[in-house]
């Protein structure tokens, strides 16, 4: 079945046989996707593994993610880190129980996942249970994910892109830049440490910096930041989608 959604032609596959043809026989032809307006923010679509068409650049990025993020060995070695972060959450809940302090369940869960992600990527904690820093980072990360995935009239009627009636392009640029500023600070800090110490961190940033130095013309600092953005979004989505509404609508628990 073929549908016309605004200016976009859409094909709906409704049978198993046709789906098999599309996904197996003609997968290269159908592997591309329409790039949303928000994905054009800071030229993200030109260097992002999510939006690039199948090409040598896309294959190289996928290989880097496979080796440095989703490799079985790396996932196995992070088991101790997961246990550590869950223990920190348990200790926080225990302290709150003893002091009879209200607990924002969504906020505590987000802080746990955020620190697990940041330790995996950058070997440092981003947030603390007793501070408001996790709330700000939560808004930035969800701001990026929400605007990139939001229904945007401009994607179906390109003539509206100039006026941006829903403000999605404006908001996407704001949150993208906020996250990139954080990445810049982290990268600068790591480069300073690398310049004064021979000890290396065993995290994604270290691996990407090594690759960037060896392949400066193929994978520069801008590419590095965009790949970090994709990594944060992928891991965050997998970990947080189960309690998204809890995070957005805080639930307080009194002990």
Model-found features: residue ranges?
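N-terminal membrane-proximal hinge/A-helix region immediately C-terminal to the signal-anchor transmembrane segment
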Residues: 1-45, 56, 60, 83-91
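A generic structural signal for alpha-helix starts
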Residues: 17, 56, 73, 237-238
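Cytochrome P450 heme-thiolate monooxygenase catalytic core
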Residues: 34-42, 76-253
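Residues that form ligand- and interface-recognition hot spots within folded domains
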Residues: 5-7, 16-17, 53, 223, ...
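Short gly/ser-rich anion-binding loops that grip negatively charged ligand groups
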Residues: 48-51, 72, 76, 107
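Short clusters of hydrophobic/aromatic residues that line enzyme substrate/ligand-binding pockets
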Residues: 30, 49, 208
């Amino acid at each position: 079945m073929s549908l016309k959604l605004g200016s976009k032609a859409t094909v709906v596959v409704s049978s198993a046989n046709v789906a098999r043809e599309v996904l197996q026989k003609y997968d290269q032809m159908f592997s591309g996707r329409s790039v949303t307006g928000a994905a054009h923010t800071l030229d993200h679509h030109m260097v992002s593994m999510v939006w690039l068409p199948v090409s040598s650049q896309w294959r190289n990025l996928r290989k880097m993610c496979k080796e440095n993020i989703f490799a079985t060995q790396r996932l196995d070695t992070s088991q101790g880190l997961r246990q550590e972060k869950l223990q920190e959450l348990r200790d926080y809940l225990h302290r709150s129980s003893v002091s009879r302090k209200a607990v924002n369940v969504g906020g505590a869960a987000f802080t746990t996942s955020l620190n697990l992600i940041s330790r995996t990527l950058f070997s440092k904690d981003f947030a603390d249970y007793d501070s408001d820093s996790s709330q700000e980072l939560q808004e930035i990360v969800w701001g990026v994910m929400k605007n990139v995935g939001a229904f945007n009239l401009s994607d179906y009627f390109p003539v509206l892109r100039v006026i941006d009636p829903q403000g999605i392009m404006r908001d996407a640029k704001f949150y993208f830049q906020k996250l990139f500023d954080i990445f810049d600070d982290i990268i600068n800090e790591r480069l300073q440490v690398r310049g004064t110490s021979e000890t290396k961190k065993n995290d994604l940033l270290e691996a990407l910096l090594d690759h960037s130095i060896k392949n400066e013309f193929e994978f520069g600092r801008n590419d590095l930041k965009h790949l970090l953005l994709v990594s944060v979004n992928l891991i965050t989505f997998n970990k947080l989608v189960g309690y998204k509404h809890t995070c957005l609508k805080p639930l307080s628990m009194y002990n």
